[in-house]
Regions:
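Core catalytic alpha/beta fold that binds nucleotide/phospho-ligands
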Residues: 1-159
Length: 159
């Protein structure tokens, strides 16, 4: 990261950037495959940190810990903040010298109105209902969803 006081960088792997091994790790549905998907996110984090800082997380014991609310942090590198998200075959990670949060959502089929009722404020619900097309509603809802998830992950509240 440079010498900037507040800096964060986002890294991601898309399906076309991943090896067959990565693809198997992130596209699974069983509990074990989901754990492997999570480990893939941490491998991306380790790759980022090794490239930018020459820290080798894989050689550090218990390198990633969690706060009481579940927010992950680097035990030996408290000056670095990170967050990981995965959805579908995508993995994203943000790394910075300030607290960070990130969320990505694959635009899968969902029950739009039912989901919107759960996550939208009254004003957001009004806007959602005014959107004219199904695609527009879906885009709006996923945008709201990812912003809220990112914020929760940034603050570490109720993760």
């Amino acid at each position: 990261m440079g010498n900037n006081a507040n800096e964060a960088h986002i890294f991601w792997k898309s399906p076309d950037q991943q090896t067959e091994v990565w693809m198997k790790q992130v596209s699974g549905k069983t509990p074990e495959e989901k754990k492997e998907q999570s480990r893939s996110g941490y491998r991306l984090l380790a790759e980022m940190i090794k490239t930018r800082y020459a820290y080798d997380l894989e050689k550090e014991t218990d390198s990633v810990m969690r706060t009481e609310t579940g927010k992950p942090y680097l035990r030996l590198h408290p000056e670095l903040f990170f967050n990981i998200s995965h959805s579908g075959e995508w993995i994203a990670c943000v790394l910075g010298n300030v607290p960070v949060g990130i969320d990505i959502q694959y635009h899968r089929e969902i029950k739009l109105e039912q989901t919107a009722r759960k996550i939208c404020t009254p004003d957001e619900w009004k806007t959602f209902m005014q959107v004219g097309t199904e695609k527009g509603k879906k885009d709006f809802l996923f945008q709201i969803w990812t912003k809220k998830e990112s914020y929760l992950k940034f603050t570490g509240m109720n993760i």
